[in-house]
Amino acid sequence: MESSTTTSYSVVSELEGTLLKNPKPFAYFMLVAFEASGLIRFATLLFLWPIIALLDVLGYRNGSLKLMIFVATAGLHESEIESVARAVLPKFFMDDISMDAWRAFGSCDKRVVVTRMPRVMVERFAKDHLSADEVIGTEIVVNRFGYATGLIQETNVDQSVFNSVANLFVDRRPQLGLGRHIISDSPTFLSLCEEQVHAPVPSNYNGHNQRLHVQPLPVIFHDGRLVKLPTPATALIILLWIPFGIILAMIRIFVGFLLPLWAIPYVSRIFNTRFIVKGKPPAQATTGNPGVLFVCTHRTLMDPVVLSYVLGRSIPAVTYSISRLSEILSPIPTFRLTRIRDVDAEMIKKELSNGDLVVYPEGTTCREPFLLRFSALFAELTDNIVPVAMNYRVGFFHATTARGWKGLDPIFFFMNPRPVYEVTFLNQLEVEATCSSGKSPYDVANYVQRILAATLGFECTNFTRKDKYRVLAGNDGTVSYLSFLDQVKKVVTTFKPFLH
């Protein structure tokens, strides 16, 4: 192979097995089935996995692909598939990226990704995070009402990909092709490329990319309830665990209501829940003295409850917007902010005069090791500021959602076999670090953000609540408040496995 350092190259790369280490797309269809539909579709696709694997072994790759697409998407609205592709799949794709393949792919100016998966599942990730110019994949047939039929337009997927690449490069063949060496009756897109590199791409391929040290654009916001990629083995474990998880969650929540707050960290060990406390929490404010403002990182809806558990007393929390059910279930008082600055400032001052209070300047949760921009409002209202770094670990289910219903966040948290919460109390801010010393509220907020990020090993960002919800849900993150009957219906439909 000729060595070249030119940046004018065009590249066509296969996604499965090349840019992604995993050559099998089955787990990604499982994600679509679970997140866009429910447990019945998820279980059905899992039970068909032996047939899908057998078809692959026998050489019927198109047949196995069409079966996966049909079971995962038939009856789903196109917007639901797009929503999962936008909010859920990028995280799992990014976790499986081959950096050697990325370096070769990222060194070229014109980048084309080819995949056997439906284009709608891949396009958002490839363009946003891999800077791809074009994505060539299968096309799902959608009826006039916007629902997927489960069928695809292509009869022979490999031949269709070959034709699409050929039509895209009419004037000149692509210089570089990255892909697996596959025996096929149809010509593959690699035969169109001047230079062909078979996966896995060597780590020292061509010795170029000397100028390129950039990483793929990281996934900061993502959604979905599943923590682990649902490979066949993992998916089976999750399915078997769910009934036990629901029972365990109900027991844990009931115990939390029954016992005093100070006893929860001790009793929770019996139910395999751990609370790790670091640092020295401040003493409770005495009568007549203003309370302490706990300024916390925001990881889940459970943050203020866990803070009250480890302090052994009820600490009221101010929230931007939570569901009515979450307010009813909360063992601590919550106060909803109006988003009107003067009104919110007056309310926080009033609550601080009554005792301690907890605020979350990020305004929303973030799952990845990043902190969103801190609102400076808290810095204007008091000098008694105690930063608290909060983080959590779960094994099966995420306890946050942007697309789903937030009222179920605590249930999903307690459905995990061994949830762990870490609470680190930092020292109260010195007077020199507060607005009393002449610092602006923005300087104070940025300082608190930096020390909390350093404590957790996170990175600071300028992203906001609105940025998160625009990426994940296409809205500004405001919760719509439903009637009690509607809340009950939503619980039932969430836990009732269904197939569209």
Curated annotation (Swiss-Prot):
Its EC number is 2.3.1.15. Keywords: Acyltransferase, Lipid biosynthesis, Lipid metabolism, Membrane, Phospholipid biosynthesis, Phospholipid metabolism, Transferase, Transmembrane, Transmembrane helix. It is found in: Membrane. GO terms for cellular component: membrane. One of its GO terms (biological process) is CDP-diacylglycerol biosynthetic process. It is a multi-pass membrane protein. It catalyses: sn-glycerol 3-phosphate + an acyl-CoA = a 1-acyl-sn-glycero-3-phosphate + CoA. GO terms for molecular function: glycerol-3-phosphate 2-O-acyltransferase activity; glycerol-3-phosphate O-acyltransferase activity. A motif (HXXXXD motif) lies at residues 298-303. Esterifies acyl-group from acyl-ACP to the sn-1 position of glycerol-3-phosphate, an essential step in glycerolipid biosynthesis. Belongs to the GPAT/DAPAT family. This is Glycerol-3-phosphate acyltransferase 7. It comes from Arabidopsis thaliana.
